[in-house]
Amino acid sequence: MPAAPAPLGDSTLVLIDCQNTYTRGVMELEGVDAALDEVAALLDRARSAGVPVIHIQHNGGAGSPYDIDAEIGAIVDRVAPREGEPVVVKSYPNAFVQTDLDDRLKAVGASNLVLAGFMTHMCVNSTARGGFNLGYAPTVVAGATAARALPGTDGQPVPAAAM
């Protein structure tokens, strides 16, 4: 693994679960608006540089907070896919499990991945590790992710920023 992250121009941008469910209600994440600002800026830079972009969308099924056929499960408008940008629908935290993400990355000659999205400690982390296990060099853009506080072993919450 390289000592430093690859430049965006030598990478493929993978946006993970940038869905409306994380912007409101029971699934709303701490710092989500600032993270989405960073995701949008990163996406603009990638598009301007001609970097391949792949969107990931979690499908939890009808009626769930991840219902991709409902507004709550849709990708946030300001970072929504443009024509030609594929969307990989997943059912597990690791976006490589039972999807065609690996095939799509191979098709664009990807070796370096720049990852952003939600939630940092779940799907972003799982996808980064899954990609590494398949030989990719993942870089997570911390400012373009968000999480929630989690219960700690001592009964005190672990802050979202620590994720």
Regions found by a protein language model. Give the residues of each.
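Flexible, glycine-rich phosphate/dinucleotide-binding loops
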Residues: Y22, A62, A147
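A generic "binding-loop/recognition-motif" signal
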Residues: C18, N59, T120
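Active-site-adjacent betaalpha module
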Residues: M1-T12, A41-D44, S48-A49, Y66-M163
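Short beta-strand segments at enzyme active-site cores
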Residues: L15, P52-H58, V141
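Glycine-rich, small/polar surface segments that engage phosphate groups of diverse ligands
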Residues: I56-S64, E71-I72
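A short alpha/beta connector and helix-capping loop motif
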Residues: M27-H55
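Short acidic, Gly/Ser-rich segments with clustered Asp/Glu that frequently serve as metal-coordination loops
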Residues: Q19-G25
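Short, glycine/acidic-enriched capping/hinge loops at junctions between secondary-structure elements
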Residues: G25-L29, P65-D67
